[in-house]
């Protein structure tokens, strides 16, 4: 078809009713700037005057589908005039082109008479989709001419969810869920499965129910009156997108369209604080909580229970792990959540036997109180029994002093222990019987490979298997079925297993991580841990302390409901999948994210669809609550609109989860193929269906601006330790895979594409506190602008900081001037600076040293994850570097490791990003 040859434009691609927009339009999805401000006329910009409707006589560049819909517009408009939708206001399609009266945000639409507001600056422009609704525009770019890629796009918000205010009962920014809680890969949902399949874009939801480690930080609004209004048919909860009908006596569900009665209690309020139904949280807020009444509770919410299972074998003692663990517990006993003063503690020590401790109440203390803490050793590992169960799980409040006394005695008891065995399996079963009546957390701290009793593991032979097709089956699979079967038992009694593995030796993370994966826990791995290195101690103790002080909820289930046509099909993350649509969490942590895959099972007739996530939970303050997260999304029959509203970061998270699953269940090669194919399919589909160009190999590599970082993220993911080819120790690879499947989105992106900062030429305000309008300093430090992760931007005399979310690398160029070296390290000789896992020394009277340390501290400051990044100091190559320098080998290893984070470069056998794009272009041109 000849008219297809004209589909490549040096500007935004056109659809019926849209204004042409310059190609230079930024990717922030903002409306075009006023041309008059730039001294240009609208005619020069190729845009009609403000408020004008495009002439029907003007040439329109349309796909066949658009032409067909173009012909149907008059008929559809006429039909709309004849329709009478119950309680749904009809909007004149042409009204979007006329001056609008702003809607008063926060006021119920039933109390307003104004038409819909025109979008404000920073919102999607009023470009009409094929059904005459405002939709996001498509801005084409050429990936090969945008090199290096504009990495600032990684910090942009997703394409807006274009929901007109009249769709909300009380229009406000809180009426639709924030992307911090839930992000859809598609912010314009295809109306049928064939369009979704044709797009080659995935449909999934990235969900993070909690945003902070501690629940008292920015909590959502809470309903405490006990009234919970749900649809009788689909059981969805009342939300800002329902409609009231029959003079407000009934409400229509936005999920299944059923009309339900409105409870009288909705309009009853405290006489001293009169409120209308529109003041209720479920009407105003898409994210809110209910205090659950008794019918949502099978039993009294249990107390928060912690069972610490501590390795006291010889390797744990020699490495300093035991002493570090005990000291951290002693310093943070008062930080363990105990909101209702019911928190309980149990401590088990394990080597070739299980050592229980009877801890008396503080009120029973007397002059011989130290003798009242009895240790009972159980050597029968086949059928271990509980000698005194009632006195081994004790109240933190009632036994606080004696718990501290016990912790101070444990290092003394085992200081001369020569036993090298570690019976983890029997100890887990004992802990299970100890706290199984109420559930809780089993926190394992281990520095030894389990080598005794049930769950005994062997060191695997990695030579000849690493970097082959056998790697997954022989190194990344679970070595003993106990570690999967045990999680089923734990899920039944609400027990989570968390692991802290710290050793210089092999630990079989691939097997042990199953304990946390299926019980909603987490595995933390500290390779090469040594108590002689203070930096190792700081990292372990910081993360362990934040973990045990983190709030969590118990007896938790999470379900996502979709409106008609949508169905949740697959679930990814750390939890137990109890049924086809129910995810069970023995305890729900605050530092993890989850991904749900969505199917379009039947055609969606409505202009908007909805997803609602409900989390039923017991807090560690004796309260039973329900957290509700509701998301509204527009639907479309236009492939261009689907692409224009695609969220590149959420899509990257989707394929990351798919790749982790493929790596664990199939092979690493299959995972890499999946990652690369995701990019190839999207580029090919965009070229075929959107660009529609018949030009040969010289054609540009087109993609829409809102997806231009997606190929970079996927290419970077293939270079991640979890997936890259080459020799990677199996423990490191298994740990990386474990982290990728549970990281919150912003940390996942940083893990895939690290932040790189140039420090030697940073702005004057970088490294200093943010100033308020009054000139007062805040506690937040100004960070430098990041640069692309490529060595081509590294100067031999520069200073650079790399942050991949797990580690920090401070790269000092080998030819740095002595003044810079002195300002940072307090010495002018670059060969005297410390290298490896170190901290920057404090240099008196050096403002630059203070600024660099401030930046590092700011990057380590998190209130939503427990991670503490160790700092590695790397000295760059120099022509003056002595060949036989004492640190030559260590420096070479550090340079190789740090360079592997510069993911735009050619790394080992992996091509550079430019080469990757050339390969993709060649493949889709065939």
From Swiss-Prot:
Zn(2+) binds at residues 231, 234, 253, 256. Keywords: Cytoplasm, Cytoplasmic vesicle, Endoplasmic reticulum, ER-Golgi transport, Golgi apparatus, Membrane, Metal-binding, Phosphoprotein, Protein transport, Transport, Zinc. Residues 231-256 are annotated as: Zinc finger-like. InterPro entries: ADF-H/Gelsolin-like_dom_sf (IPR029006), Gelsolin-like_dom (IPR007123), Gelsolin-like_dom_sf (IPR036180), Sec23/24_helical_dom (IPR006900), Sec23/24_helical_dom_sf (IPR036175), Sec23/24_trunk_dom (IPR006896), Sec23_24_beta_S (IPR012990), SEC23_SEC24_subfamily (IPR050550). Residues 24-50 are annotated as: Disordered. Pfam families: Gelsolin, Sec23_BS, Sec23_helical, Sec23_trunk, zf-Sec23_Sec24. The modification Phosphoserine is found at residue 178. It comes from the Eukaryota. The keyword ATP-binding does not apply. Component of the coat protein complex II (COPII) which promotes the formation of transport vesicles from the endoplasmic reticulum (ER). The coat has two main functions, the physical deformation of the endoplasmic reticulum membrane into vesicles and the selection of cargo molecules. SEC24 specifically recruits cargo proteins like BET1 or SYS1 to the COPII vesicles. The SEC23/24 complex is also involved in internalization of plasma membrane proteins like the maltose transporter. The COPII coat is composed of at least 7 proteins: the SEC23/24 complex, the SEC13/31 complex, SFB2, SFB3 and the protein SAR1. Interacts with BET1, EMP24, GRH1, SEC22, SED5 and SYS1. This is Protein transport protein SEC24.
